[in-house]
């Protein structure tokens, strides 16, 4: 029993020591957001200009609808190879695969201009440009841009950050071991003391019921009468 108590005390001391060490390095959510922004800028810096690679850093969209005509302009900033004109494909949901468009490219700025009528059956216009996919709703030229290499903050990412970068997983492992040990110890106590007494109590009552004589043992006393 002394060894078991010593083990419990050791586990509790380890958990307390781990928590104290983590307090100095724990970062708030605001600090984590700043670190995430720094990592975004670091990724952008790592995307150095390379030949034959198209990289999108930022973009702007403008749209003008005059009567039944729609003029939309997508302006991308980054790095684009001279053959980007053959890699940009526009299509919509009405079945028209290659939407007529104009492309201007100076290597750092790519401008895609679409001039066409906007009938009711036009649901959206997609621009296939790696690694970007743009979409616009009906009579709307404000596509949503999603860059796959820019992470979006979420509670799951923040919890994972705390677990792995701040060594919180050690605390969780210690908690699991501690609670497993406590449950096992509680089960042992129940079986060793309460279960044994209950067994002898039932055995004594059965013996008295069928023989009329009480059974003497170290845990119970004979019934008088």
UniProtKB/Swiss-Prot annotation:
Glycosylation sites noted in the Swiss-Prot or TrEMBL record: 69
Keyword check for Nucleotide-binding: no
Residue ranges that the UniProt entry lists as topological domain Cytoplasmic: 192-225
Any one biological process term the GO annotation gives: symbiont-mediated perturbation of host defense response
Membrane topology, from the record: Single-pass type I membrane protein
Domain (Ig-like H-type): residue spans on this chain: 54-145
The protein's name: Unique short US7 glycoprotein
A single cellular component GO annotation: host cell endoplasmic reticulum membrane
Family membership noted in the UniProt record: Belongs to the cytomegalovirus US6 family.
Pfam families for this protein: CMV_US
Gene from which this protein is expressed: US7
Signal peptide: 1-17
Upper lineage: Viruses, Duplodnaviria, Heunggongvirae, Peploviricota, Herviviricetes
Annotated disulfide bonds: 63-141
Highest taxon listed in the record's lineage: Viruses
Membrane side Lumenal: residue ranges: 18-170
């Amino acid at each position: 029993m002394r060894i078991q108590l010593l083990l419990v005390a050791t586990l509790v001391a380890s958990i307390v020591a781990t928590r104290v060490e983590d307090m100095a390095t724990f970062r708030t959510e605001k600090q984590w957001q700043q670190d995430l922004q720094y990592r975004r800028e670091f990724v952008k810096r790592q995307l150095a200009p390379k030949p034959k690679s198209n990289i999108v850093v930022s973009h702007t969209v403008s749209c003008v609808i005059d009567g039944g005509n729609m003029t939309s302009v997508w302006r991308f900033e980054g790095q684009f190879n001279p053959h980007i004109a053959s890699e940009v494909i526009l299509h919509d949901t009405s079945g028209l695969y290659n939407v007529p468009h104009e492309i201007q490219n100076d290597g750092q700025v790519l401008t895609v201009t679409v001039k066409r009528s906007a009938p009711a059956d036009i649901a959206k216009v997609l621009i296939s440009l790696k690694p970007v996919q743009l979409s616009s709703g009906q009579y709307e030229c404000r596509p949503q841009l999603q860059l796959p290499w820019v992470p979006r903050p979420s509670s799951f990412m923040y919890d994972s950050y705390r677990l792995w970068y701040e060594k919180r997983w050690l605390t969780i492992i210690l908690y699991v071991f501690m609670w497993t040990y406590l449950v096992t110890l509680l089960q042992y106590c129940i079986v060793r003391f309460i279960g044994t007494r209950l067994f002898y109590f039932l055995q004594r009552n059965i013996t008295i019921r069928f023989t009329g004589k009480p059974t003497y043992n170290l845990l119970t006393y004979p019934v008088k009468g």
